[in-house]
Amino acid sequence: MLIVVNDSPFYKGDTAILRQLVGGDRISCKLKHANVRHEFSYSGWVLIVGNEYLGMSETSGALARRMIVFPARNAVHLKKFLIKEEHGLFMGPLAEEISEIAKWALSMPDQDATEIMRDPEIHCPSLSEENKLCRENLNHISACLMKTPCSSSKPSQGICHAHDPIS
């Protein structure tokens, strides 16, 4: 199992729950839709991603012993092909093509439009490879780890902290 904490700010608060999670301790919680207390032990990874190193107020070293810090320098940049401006105007590489795309879609017979919407990759094979690349690039953890592997491949109890320094 994996717990992901993204866009983590510099934090020096209480780390008791985090220590319980990565230490294999019993954690007490309340079950949803029931007035019952429950205890569980978590055995998995905790991934904390942020622009600064994780600051800890605890002095026992319990978290530090379980933490693997690695720099994540392979940023996946968002590409916007169509940007909505004020007053309903659009900017970007596709802005000039909107009217032609709309004409093409509206002039198409209903049956053809339905088939294309149902399985677009058959009617446009290049979409298959493009969709695969998009899925890989949208998974920021996957994109980052493809070039910056974590030093441990065994998902035992631990923290993997990705540090993405601001340039």
Curated annotation (Swiss-Prot):
Chief location category: mitochondrion
UniProt KW keywords: Mitochondrion
Source superkingdom: Eukaryota
GO cellular component: mitochondrion
The keyword Mitochondrion belongs to this UniProt entry's keyword annotation: yes
Location of the protein in the cell: Mitochondrion
Record's protein name: Uncharacterized mitochondrial protein ymf20
